[in-house]
Structures are given as C-alpha cells and as structure tokens.
Amino acid sequence: MKKSKRTDRKGSIHIQSTFNNTLITVSDAQGACVCWSSAGLVGFKGAKKGTPFAAGMAAEKVAQLAKDQGMKQVDVFVKGPGAGRETAIRALEAAGLQITSIQDVTGIPHNGCRPPKRRRV
C-alpha cells in the first residue's frame, strides 16, 4: 500500500543524539510520526554510528522523506550529548528544509541516577 502524501507544510523534527547513535524523527503538527531515520538505518554499524558524518547522512535521508511528504518548515528539538547534534541540523538546512526554531530539550537530572564511571584513556 502506497503512503498518501500529506498536505502539512509545517512539522517538527526530534534529534536524539547519544554517544552511540543518532535518531531523527519527523512528526506533523498533531504529533503523529511521519518518518524516521537513524545512523544504523542508513548503513553504519558499530562505533561508526556515533560519528557526526553518520548523523549527517541520517538527517539527509529524513529530510528527503519529509520533503516527499510535502513538508517545508520545521521546528527542531535536540536531545542528548552526542557528536551528531550540530551536523544533523546543518544537513537538514542544506537539504532544503526551512528551520523556524531550534530548541534543546536535553533532560537535566535533579540528582537522579548515578552517572557512568570516568573514562581512563
């Protein structure tokens, strides 16, 4: 069954960037998921999923899918400490989507879970 083209010109893009992967989700004005992509879905495996280049490739793919659905303007919400945050936003802009706002929605713990131990390199 072929997906029907939506007429929503405005939507929101959520970028969740972790140290191991970058997930990008596009939703319409009502909040329903239109399409999504990740560094793993684009073809990267293992440690390469956490790189900025992989995040850029995932953002290019999701931007193309969103444009095929008729989306023009997007609000961007970024969550997480990963390396692909800025690269994904730049790739969305370069793909032709008009970004109206960028908002950081990273959760800040009020002394919740104990963080992982410090790395010794």
UniProtKB/Swiss-Prot annotation:
- Main subcellular location of this protein, as a coarse class: plastid
Relate the assembly described in the record: Part of the 30S ribosomal subunit.
Q: Which GO terms describe its cellular component?
A: chloroplast; ribonucleoprotein complex; ribosome
Q: Which InterPro entries does the record cross-reference, listed alphabetically?
A: Ribosomal_uS11 (IPR001971), Ribosomal_uS11_bac-type (IPR019981), Ribosomal_uS11_sf (IPR036967)
* Name under which the protein is recorded: Small ribosomal subunit protein uS11c
HAMAP family reported in the protein's UniProt record: Ribosomal_uS11
| Family according to the record | Belongs to the universal ribosomal protein uS11 family.
| Name of one Pfam family that matches | Ribosomal_S11
Species, as recorded: Cyanidioschyzon merolae (strain NIES-3377 / 10D)
Q: Which UniProt keywords apply?
A: Chloroplast, Plastid, Ribonucleoprotein, Ribosomal protein, RNA-binding, rRNA-binding
Concerning PANTHER family, the annotation shows: 40S RIBOSOMAL PROTEIN S14/30S RIBOSOMAL PROTEIN S11 (PTHR11759)
Q: Do you know which SUPFAM superfamilies this protein is assigned to?
A: Translational machinery components
Signal sequence interval, chain numbering: none
Q: In its UniProt record, which GO terms are filed under biological process?
A: translation
A GO molecular-function annotation: structural constituent of ribosome
UniProt subcellular location:
Plastid, Chloroplast
The major lineage groups are:
Eukaryota, Rhodophyta, Bangiophyceae, Cyanidiales, Cyanidiaceae
